Amino acid sequence: MAADTFRISRRRALSLAGVSAAAGVGAGVAAGRSAPDASAVPADPAALKYPFYGEHQAGITTPAQDRLHFAVFDVDDIPREELISLLQDWTIAAARMSQGGSAGEFAPDAGPYEAPPEDTGEAMDLGPTGLTITFGFGPTLFTAADGTDRFGIADRRPRALVDLPRFSGDMLDERISGGDLCIQACADDPQVAVHAIRNLSRIAFGRASLRYSQLGFGRTSSTSTAQVTPRNLFGFKDGTANLKAEDPAAVDEHVWVADSDDQAWMAGGSYLVSRKIRMNIEPWDRTRLSEQERAIGRTKGHGAPLSGGDEFTAPDFSMPGSGGKPIIAEQAHVRLAHPDTNGGARMLRRGYNFVDGNDDLGRLNAGLFFLCFQRDPERSFIPVQTRLAGSDLLNEYTRHVGSAIFAVPGGAAEGSYVGARLFES
Amino acid sequence: MITARLPKPAVVAAACGILFVTACTPNASAETAAGGTGELSVTSTAEDCSVSAATAESGPLTFTIRNAGDQVTEFYLLAEDGLRIVSEVENIGPGISRNLVVNATPGSYYTVCKPGMVGDGVGRAAFTVTDSGTAVEPAGDEQAQIDAALTNYKAYVKDQVDQLLTGTEDFAAAYVAGNDDEARRLYPTTRMHFERVEPVAESFGDLDPKLDNREADLAEGEEWTGWHRIEKDLWPPADAGYVPLTQAEREAVAAQLVEDTTTLHSSIQGIELSLDQLANGAIGLMDEVANGKVTGEEEIWSGTDLWDFQGNVEGARVLADGLRNLLESRDPELAATLDADFTSLSAELDKHRTSAPDAAQRDIAYVSYGDLASEDVKALSDRVNALSEPLSRITAALLG
């Protein structure tokens, strides 16, 4: 059954890819197997669209868009059937919107005149602008804090969907942590991403409600070799060593859950860890350049490792510098986060910068909304973050204030819905 | 107003001939080719050290050194005797460019690169600085001033840690004896000694977390020791089901605190400090204020953040004052700005001081952080930012 679904979905994805490619759009990404044709510049960037249905959900290996609206929901005390119907409704609306359509059956200016419009309308005329909508399930959807099996799926909770441990220095705010369901909406136009979350939230009323949501701008990772590495709010290039869609073997090994992994319903899916990392912007800005580069382990300009070369030169962690100390400091971020330091652990990072205005002290409330996808957090995020939390030189300038983990199921076949296999016997 | 406070380039670089010149690299990414006045490019390879020109006019010179070799390299500007280092830049990785800014007086020099960071270097070449007619400030007797600053600061650190140890012993004794009122009086006033020299204490990597970890700093399963563990026991949370420490637990955590403080005390006896550490210590202390004290996150149980705040500011002021003579000759404007900003921050803090100005150390008192209005905290934060910006420029002003 599952194999059939995937065969169909992959054919479907390929046919959609053909359509998209005609419009100059990088395609094949939804299937997660082939590289996006990034050399082709869309004639109209607003028309950029990615297939919604496929083996994998879009929005993971899709070339990272410029804007994010990430939303986390808590599910009301509803029967299992209503949870399923919510996922079905969300899937249909998300599929439509990702192709530039309305959230509902009718356009925002159509439908019964005495009824409120089904679609809120602010995305009219904007085009899909590369919108992807990605759904995930939090630990509390499977098992409530008191152990209750809320929807008869407790025995299907994947082993890899662990409760994240407490890391040194965590200053987590419960109000922006955890949650039952997540939706990651990414697009090149912020209003398109916001429109998606707004309409999906509206659809959920009575079944699930917003727990918290986060706007992001300025993607901080590139997920395709065709993308220039962007900068985070420390002013440094971020994500140079990220997993890229063009390396399907590495993506298969480190991102996608395999058929043989634990829970079969998660095959083709991934695990998402989100961390809201506040940056102590003002002290950082007062830090001398030499110290900034020492903390990161790369040059600020080109992003080359301090051991030399250019941005994509592999860091040489053993290279001695003056005074017999390594030229890349023992506690430099690049060293502690690097796969070589972490038994080869890798993940696909997909984070965004954020500025939530300012705090009461007149300081920018800004930082990195870190998102990463991986096959098993216990082999990727958790050991890496444990190492970083212990001694990263950057810790002086950051604090983790939000945290969550979600099981992101594989993509849906057309006619089905996201997460259907979780509920099938 | 930041630009108004930027030290003038000519003044900034004056120290390069004497001090730790690794910091003379204000712009690591600049790739400007030689050509403009005072701009020179250097290419360092395994065999050679080619400089774009063999002469330059006196005044500020910028060498842009590009490492075209495959080993880490260094670049030196040597004095006429070919031995004394006028200026240098270290740790240039292969393929990386870095700038060296130096304020050169007329005379004969040598340039040399040191790929691999060992040996006498390669490509040694004569370099002549002709008189541009514009006077370059002489360095004067700066080394004597630097030595005095280091000696004075080391004495200050020792004195503070002496008092910290004595105070900690008294605090621990009061706590173990169940004299909690006395312990609560000694807690913030003793910690001020630690806060005044915090960057030095933090330089002993293992000790700082044992002494000063907050509950939020702990990883899962990590043991909590030090000041803040006792703080929570002396100011227990009112609402939740906090379990007070038993007498045996009190004795253990107090003994550990005294033991770790004793270790800190003996560790600092032979401490060596550099001018670089002094200059950065001041801004480090103000970062401590910005990241923890002004937000009330340092002393969440006792609310005694303002004692720590005052300790950090006093420590920063001692550092800045110790460097004042040096700074005065380089950048009098910066020195004056710092004086004014320290004064206005202290005035803001004094508004919340409840003890007399001449109170003994153990009687110093402030209002609890929780009693500050949000506009009070904003005003303090604004003054911290106002002071920290010019303070962060001391290192560049002194070292290049």
Language-model regions, residue ranges each:
Chain A
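N-terminal secretory signal peptides
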Residues: 1-8
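Long, histidine/aromatic-enriched segments associated with O2/redox biology
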Residues: 12-31, 39-425
